[in-house]
């Protein structure tokens, strides 16, 4: 076991969610070498199990020395090193009113000058520093707390279990094996004439494929956790607001036959197939001299740039014309896009030009004909059709370090193909390994660690 990092001060905070100001139970967590003694000063108990490790016992919180009680509580003690933080930890399980639990917390803080309010994420930071969890597990705990849907929670929990660390360490070990062979030759100045370049390139290719798969999944599982922002784009009166109302299952936008009714952006947050989606209704795009409508149209183009996915809607009655083509040309080529032909109930689909049908969803928004096909198309194009195959959540920090490692490995290819000195190969492999180590927290500065944990909630 890693040695336990001790600090002079003991920290305390409310660890349970009481955002509405009341609940059945609230938990105050205390961690540090003075946690038990500090709690002893404010707790009165007759339990025979009092202050034993991993025992729950009953007691009262004393307001003062005159034996006036604040609350009746359950107390859980977890002695070092067998606790979340690796330090002595005490949990006070109080009644859940915010006024009451804050009073208990203030009583605790005033009992000992070495007990202070915890900083955001400080319990998890101490757990990390004491080797109880790695950085990906700490981040996954925060991700789990902030999960917006069940699939996001499942992915976060896999990180809590250490699955991210395992995948990263497997890749790192592959690179360490390659580095050992290279450095043995460099250190002993052996001749590289018998070095199997093809075998090396083959092994590195396998490692790169593993990293590329993780990067690909990282982009997809961002949709699962953060959601997909979907902009409804098109000319006036093609059915954008009607589609928003259909997906929302309620009237969120005003629908009329008057062109230019929608003049501002309307956003609705939904969960479809357990994936959060933000549907954005925009002003219809057309030439206009009306000032307010023009502002709305500018916002439409802004939303095109900001959104993950574009649904371009046109009227099958009018057909896909030059104006539609001109608008689509304004959409960045890297954007995911689906073209939707609306009002199929008003035309004979057999008469539609076959080129117009290519990669187009035909729909009658008014009659709710084609909604399932549209949703399936969005999920497929976002790479979420086999969402069950994505089994870990990688955040932007992980993605950055994986991309840096991949760049290091691509540089080793260049070194070998151009027959550059082998010590350069060793440097790139070491840098690649270092980038992977940053993911699990082995190669990070104190400042960066503080920044990561500052984004956690106070009681975690």
Curated annotation (Swiss-Prot):
Subcellular location: Cytoplasm
One GO CC term on file: cytosol
Top enzyme category: hydrolase
EC number: 3.6.-.-
Cofactor list: K(+)
Positions contributing to (6S)-5-formyl-5,6,7,8-tetrahydrofolate binding: 29, 91, 132, 460
Record-linked CDD domains: trmE, TrmE_N
Name of a matching Pfam family: MnmE_helical
Residues reported to bind GTP: 237-242, 256-262, 281-284
InterPro entries: G_TrmE, GTP-bd, GTP-bd_TrmE_N, GTPase_MnmE, MnmE_dom2, MnmE_helical, P-loop_NTPase, Small_GTP-bd
Residue ranges of domain TrmE-type G in the record: 227-383
Coiled coil: none
Highest taxon above the source species: Bacteria
Keyword list, A-Z: Cytoplasm, GTP-binding, Hydrolase, Magnesium, Metal-binding, Nucleotide-binding, Potassium, tRNA processing
GO BP term, example: tRNA wobble uridine modification
Cofactor remark from the record: Binds 1 potassium ion per subunit.
PROSITE patterns, per database record: G_TRME
Sites where the protein binds K(+): 237, 256, 258, 261
Binding site for Mg(2+): 241, 262
Gene Ontology molecular function, alphabetical: GTP binding; GTPase activity; metal ion binding
Record function comment: Exhibits a very high intrinsic GTPase hydrolysis rate. Involved in the addition of a carboxymethylaminomethyl (cmnm) group at the wobble position (U34) of certain tRNAs, forming tRNA-cmnm(5)s(2)U34.
PANTHER family associated with the record: TRNA MODIFICATION GTPASE GTPBP3, TRNA MODIFICATION GTPASE GTPBP3, MITOCHONDRIAL
Quaternary state and interactors: Homodimer. Heterotetramer of two MnmE and two MnmG subunits.
Assigned protein family: Belongs to the TRAFAC class TrmE-Era-EngA-EngB-Septin-like GTPase superfamily. TrmE GTPase family.
Name of the protein described by the UniProt record: tRNA modification GTPase MnmE
């Amino acid at each position: 076991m890693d040695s336990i990092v001790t600090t002079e001060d003991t920290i305390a905070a409310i660890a349970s969610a009481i955002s509405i100001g009341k609940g059945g139970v609230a938990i105050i967590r205390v961690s540090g070498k003075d946690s038990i003694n500090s709690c002893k000063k404010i707790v009165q108990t007759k339990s025979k199990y009092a202050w034993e490790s991993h025992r729950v016992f009953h007691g009262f919180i004393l307001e003062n020395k005159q034996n006036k009680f604040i609350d009746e509580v359950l107390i859980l003690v977890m002695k070092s090193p067998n606790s979340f933080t690796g330090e002595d930890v005490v949990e006070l399980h109080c009644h859940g009113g915010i006024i009451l639990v804050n009073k208990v917390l203030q009583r605790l803080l005033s009992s000992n000058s070495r007990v202070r309010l915890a900083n955001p994420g400080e319990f998890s930071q101490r757990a990390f520093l004491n080797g109880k969890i790695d950085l990906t597990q700490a981040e996954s705990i925060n991700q789990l707390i902030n999960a917006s849907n069940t699939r996001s929670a499942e992915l976060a929990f896999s990180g809590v279990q250490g699955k991210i660390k395992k995948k990263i360490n497997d890749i790192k070990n592959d690179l360490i094996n390659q580095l050992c062979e290279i450095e043995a030759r460099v250190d002993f100045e052996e001749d590289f004439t018998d070095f199997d370049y093809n075998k090396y390139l083959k092994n590195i290719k396998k490692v790169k494929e593993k990293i590329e798969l993780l990067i690909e999944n990282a982009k997809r599982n961002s949709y699962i956790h953060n959601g997909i922002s979907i902009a409804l784009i098109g000319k006036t009166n093609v059915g954008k607001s009607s589609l928003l109302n259909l997906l929302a299952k309620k009237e969120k936008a005003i629908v009329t036959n008057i062109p230019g009714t929608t003049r501002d952006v309307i956003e609705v947050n939904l969960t479809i197939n357990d994936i959060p989606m933000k549907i954005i209704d925009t002003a219809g795009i057309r030439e206009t001299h009306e000032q307010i409508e023009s502002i709305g149209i500018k916002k439409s183009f802004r939303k095109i740039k900001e959104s993950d996915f574009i649904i371009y809607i046109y009227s099958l009655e009018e057909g896909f014309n030059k104006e539609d083509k001109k608008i689509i040309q304004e959409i960045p080529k890297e954007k995911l896009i689906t073209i939707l032909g609306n009002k199929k109930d008003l035309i004979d689909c057999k008469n539609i030009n076959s080129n117009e049908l290519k990669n187009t969803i035909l729909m009658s928004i008014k009659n709710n004909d084609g909604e399932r096909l549209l949703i399936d198309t969005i999920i497929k194009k976002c790479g979420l059709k086999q969402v069950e195959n994505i089994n870990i959540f990688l955040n932007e920090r992980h993605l950055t370090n994986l991309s840096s490692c991949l760049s290091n490995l691509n540089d080793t290819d260049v070194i070998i193909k151009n027959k550059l000195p082998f010590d350069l190969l060793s440097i790139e492999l070491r840098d690649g390994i270092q980038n992977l180590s940053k993911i699990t927290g082995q190669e990070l500065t104190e400042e960066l660690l503080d920044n990561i944990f500052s984004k956690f909630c106070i009681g975690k």
